[in-house]
Amino acid sequence: MSTFRDDIIRFLTDEGFIPGRDGLWPQVLSVAEPQRLILPVEICATSPQEAEAQARDTERIVLEIKEKTGQMPLIMTEDRWLRQTGMMKARLLAHLGRHMQVYARNCEVRRIEKGVAAEFLGRCHSYGDAACRYRYGMFLKRHTGHLAAEGMGQALEAGTLVAVATFSNARKWVKGDKVIRSYEWTRYASLPELRVSGGMGKLLRAFIEEAEPDDIMSYADLEWSEGAVYEQLGFAGEADKEAVMFRVDPRTWERVPLRAGAREEEGTIPGTGRNLFFMNFGSRKYRLKLTEYPSE
């Protein structure tokens, strides 16, 4: 029987890469050129307890890899691969250096409608759309970048929507003698086959110019990133958010959070008689303070 891991190996081989089994971690795939480690994570747990044990084992492997190689492996989960196949394949190739490159200076930012943002995020963000107040799109004005590898097809046309960022409405609270307006950066995504150099920063500046926030917070999904890009933008890490337990529908591979304190049977998928569970790796909270105010 073909496995999820076999599917990744077959895809990489068809794309001209030579994936092999890593000598230290049998679960991990190694690609020599460029040197990258890929960690496939199957969705096979039939109870929350089993999913938690699997998550702890995955975290252990990731930590060992980081300690020995200084490299964060690319984590590929089975549900994402099967539910968002095109996006995940493009992301995988991009991490291996096969992507198109454009520069934010050759793009313009403008507000976009709810439907446009939702459609783009549905295709390009792991968690799709989310409730928000502000929606911005980055559109290509002219393409003066390059293809990072051959075989990427035609350059994008002027006017192409290449990235989207969304922000919440303001939350207000009193800090000392100031009323602070704090916003959440809820989503950012670019076309998965694309690298937009300076894209996040340009979208952030557009929001700051319009909303004039005192404070912006966001979360880095530790399944994908440890948040270095937020630090480059001036955000400071605050705390890690606990991992979330999901049930996964094996027919559609959709994740649904299992609410805290729920009984295991409440995660049952109607008509299947089978439960699958996955525990993610949590997230890291970041904050950008644009107005000085006391922390307490």
Name these PLM-found stretches.
Residues 219-293:
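Active-site/acyl-donor-binding loops of N-acyltransferases
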Residues 51-83:
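Catalytic cores of nucleic-acid endonucleases
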Residues 33-58, 170-171:
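Short beta-strand-loop-alpha-helix junction that forms the active-site gateway
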Residues 87-91, 96-214, 220-228, 232-233, ...:
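A conserved beta-strand-loop-helix scaffold within acyl/acetyltransferase catalytic domains
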Residues 21-23, 128-132, 277-281:
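A short catalytic or substrate-binding loop motif that flags glycine-/basic-rich loops and adjacent residues
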Residues 19, 72-74, 237:
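Hydrophobic beta-strand scaffold residues
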Residues 1-22:
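Acidic-basic catalytic patches of nuclease active cores, encompassing PD-(D/E)XK
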Residues 27-37, 181-183:
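Active-site beta-strand-loop-beta-strand hairpin of nuclease catalytic cores
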